[in-house]
UniProtKB/Swiss-Prot annotation:
Xref: Pfam families: MinE (PF03776)
InterPro entries recorded: MinE, MinE_sf
Species lineage: Bacteria, Pseudomonadati, Pseudomonadota, Alphaproteobacteria, Hyphomicrobiales
Functional note: Prevents the cell division inhibition by proteins MinC and MinD at internal division sites while permitting inhibition at polar sites. This ensures cell division at the proper site by restricting the formation of a division septum at the midpoint of the long axis of the cell.
Keywords noted in UniProt: Cell cycle, Cell division
NCBIfam families registered for this protein in UniProt: minE, PRK00296.1
GO biological process, one term: regulation of division septum assembly
Family note: Belongs to the MinE family.
Record-given protein name: Cell division topological specificity factor
Amino acid sequence: MSVLTFLKPRGSGSVARERLQLILAHERVENGRPDLIITLREEILNVIAKHVTVERDKVQIKLERGEGVSTLGVDIEFPVDAVIKPKAKAKRAIA
């Protein structure tokens, strides 16, 4: 990773992926935390809401635990006439 790549703002997808990985790793340590699905659902909804309007009750999240592996399933029902929100211009800090 170069210095320029490090300073470049990251996309919401990579941030969401990192958050999910951290949450899943944390869940494996605490094993059985009841509010994990709620936390995951809210994080995922917040990322999606930046791009498309989705009804909160149309998002289903399943966490299945196996031997040494957890699987996260996400089902999102998008309306046929879904409108993609315009990207907001990133604010740049003056160094």
